[in-house]
Swiss-Prot record:
A zinc finger (RING-type) spans 302-340. This is Mitochondrial ubiquitin ligase activator of NFKB 1. Its main location: mitochondrion. It comes from Mus musculus (Mouse). Pfam families: GIDE (PF12483), zf-C3HC4_3 (PF13920). The gene is Mul1.
Length: 352
């Protein structure tokens, strides 16, 4: 294959990048779609008096992926908020987040940057109980921190701005980092809050437990109801599907463009080869019919008009095949009629 027919480096990089991005997006889409399908297949169980009876009749006294909703109740002690009075919960998360501006040497802009510099999570055992009074049933929640959607509520949030002197400001400007301050946050799962648990529901020694599911399914302890949770997951699936289609179309369009360019170049090469064969055949026919005196003049004739003598040497290919008038009539960019290489320089040829 000639070098002109090969895809450019930019085209190869574009095709490879778009293909790789499409593959990554498709993998994420498959994972999201699988999670949504698993949520649709989860069994909804009412937190009531018949809960233990339902589990005792289930295979292995277990529902592998169940949905249950109830109110949060501590087993023994509770956690008190450090900043809000009379705020009690069963999970407490304290975070310190640093905010600063970082100079981007590529875009020459200051960009916002934040990172967690300290985080501590405290938990105490808790149950899910029915909202109705007088129902003596509860579900013990195990390993709540393994949940992918822990329904914590922000109960306190305060930003502490950085205090800088003039010399500090100059030093930060030179270093490329300008601190803005520290954000202090407290999140809690309050006692009495409504929680939707999705996981493995097990009856063990007359006690019901909700724990992380097996087989790679996701564990949820969400403040949203099940329908809202499912709708959010399906919306995420649709978004990733659109991204896959967009990048997939871009990949197919790039591949089509490269293949079309290859096809057109091949057709042009075949056409030029056919023209050259027809010319050689016609020249041989003229030579066979011409007298010996005319054969020498025909060999020196321009391959385009066959009337004038060859008077141009084309570089870089070195072919001598055209008169000056036919060379000037060639379309831009000018190419050799024999090999189709671009003509970079012309040397006049003088016939004696």
């Amino acid at each position: 294959m000639e070098s002109g027919s090969r895809p450019s480096l930019g085209q190869v990089i574009l095709l490879g990048t778009s293909s790789m991005v499409t593959a990554v997006l498709y993998s994420i889409y498959r994972q999201k779609a699988q999670v949504a399908q698993e949520l649709k297949g989860a069994k909804k169980i009412h937190l009531g008096e018949d809960l233990k009876g339902i589990l005792s009749e289930a295979p292995g006294k277990c529902v592998p992926y169940a949905v249950i909703e109830g109110a949060v109740r501590s087993v023994k002690e509770t956690l008190n908020s450090q900043f809000v009075e009379n705020c009690k919960g069963v999970i407490q998360r304290l975070s310190l987040q640093e905010h600063k501006m970082v100079w981007n040497r590529t875009t020459h802009l200051w960009n916002d940057y934040s990172k967690i510099i300290h985080q501590r999570t405290n938990t105490v055992p808790f149950d899910l109980v029915p909202h109705e009074d007088g129902v003596a049933v509860s579900v013990r929640v195990l390993k709540p921190l393994d949940s992918v959607d822990l329904g914590l509520e922000t109960v306190y949030e305060k930003f502490h701005p950085s205090v800088q002197s003039f010399t500090d400001a100059i030093g930060h400007y030179i270093s490329g980092e300008r601190p803005k301050g520290i954000q202090e946050t407290e999140e809690m799962l309050k006692v009495g809050a409504t929680l939707t648990g999705i996981g493995e529901l097990v009856l063990d020694n007359n006690a019901v437990r909700l724990q992380p599911p097996k087989q790679g399914m996701q564990y949820y302890l969400s403040s949203q109801d099940f329908d809202s949770l499912l709708h959010r997951q399906e919306s995420s699936v649709r978004l990733w599907k659109i991204l896959v289609l967009v990048f997939g179309f871009a990949t197919c369009a790039t591949l089509f463009f490269i293949l079309r360019k290859q096809y057109l170049h091949r057709q042009e090469r075949l056409r030029q080869q056919q023209l050259q064969e027809e010319f050689l055949e016609h020249e041989a026919q003229l030579l066979s019919q011409a007298s010996p005196e005319d054969r020498e003049s025909l060999k020196s004739a321009c391959v385009v008009c066959l009337s004038n003598f060859k008077s141009c040497v084309f570089l870089e290919c070195g072919h001598v095949c055209s008169c000056r008038q036919c060379y000037l009539a060639l379309p831009e960019p000018k190419r050799c009629p024999i090999c189709r290489r671009e003509i970079t320089r012309v040397i006049p040829l003088y016939n004696s």
